[in-house]
């Protein structure tokens, strides 16, 4: 039966993020990003609709943001602030995670994140009722990234002001920048392989002109059969 973490258990969860950061660096990654979006645990702590706690991790925006700050602090201890970023998704509503006062919540959070001198703040594009990008820009003293549903043209218009992020398109097109430069067609990501085991959907997407065989499936150039 699901239950809320006891207050004394929360520090051990932050330590799990610390260990994950250490392992990522040992594996050769340049940096780490805290996924505090899409209804995952950090956003569940942050959002008033899911956080019903009455201890120091619940109630006010400051308390609800405490878990995120403590996790980031643990990650920074391992990687340094210049190699640690965060992704947030105001009002995405994914996994039914909602907040009664998102502007107040995210205003406090972004101000607090700026104090940590993170490598960047990654904003997921959402259909929010308020302009969260306009809210974040003057409050965050660092690079601001925007991602989600972008293509070459929409990303180009953003790069002059901030930075653009590609996720699933990069997964499906390991040579994405070269394809953009050449105006070449793009492979569509196979969503049925997301969060699955094995190499399919991870390392079997070809670059232009390349053919890869995985099992009995032949993947070609800019079109997946």
Q: Which sequence ranges carry the predicted segments?
A:
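Flavin-dependent oxidoreductase catalytic cores
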Residues: 1-225
């Amino acid at each position: 039966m699901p239950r809320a973490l006891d207050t004394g258990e929360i520090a051990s969860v932050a330590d799990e993020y610390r260990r994950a950061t250490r392992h990522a660096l040992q594996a050769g990654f340049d940096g780490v990003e805290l996924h505090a979006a899409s209804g995952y645990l950090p956003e569940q702590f942050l959002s008033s609709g899911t956080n019903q706690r009455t201890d120091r991790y619940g109630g006010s925006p400051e308390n609800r943001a405490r878990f995120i700050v403590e996790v980031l602090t643990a990650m920074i201890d391992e990687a340094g602030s210049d190699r640690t970023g965060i992704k947030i998704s105001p009002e995405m509503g994914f996994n039914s995670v909602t907040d009664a006062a998102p502007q107040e919540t995210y205003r406090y959070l972004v101000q607090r994140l700026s104090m940590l001198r993170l490598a960047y703040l990654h904003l997921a594009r959402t259909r929010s009722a308020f302009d969260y990008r306009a809210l974040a820009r003057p409050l965050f003293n660092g690079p601001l990234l925007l991602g989600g549903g972008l293509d070459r043209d929409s990303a180009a218009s953003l790069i002059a002001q901030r930075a653009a992020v590609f996720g699933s398109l990069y997964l499906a097109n390991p040579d994405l920048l070269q394809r953009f430069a050449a105006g070449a067609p793009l492979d569509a990501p196979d969503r049925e392989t997301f969060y699955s085991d094995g190499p399919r959907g991870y390392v079997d997407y070809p670059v232009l002109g390349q053919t890869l065989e995985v099992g009995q499936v032949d993947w070609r150039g800019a079109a997946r059969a």
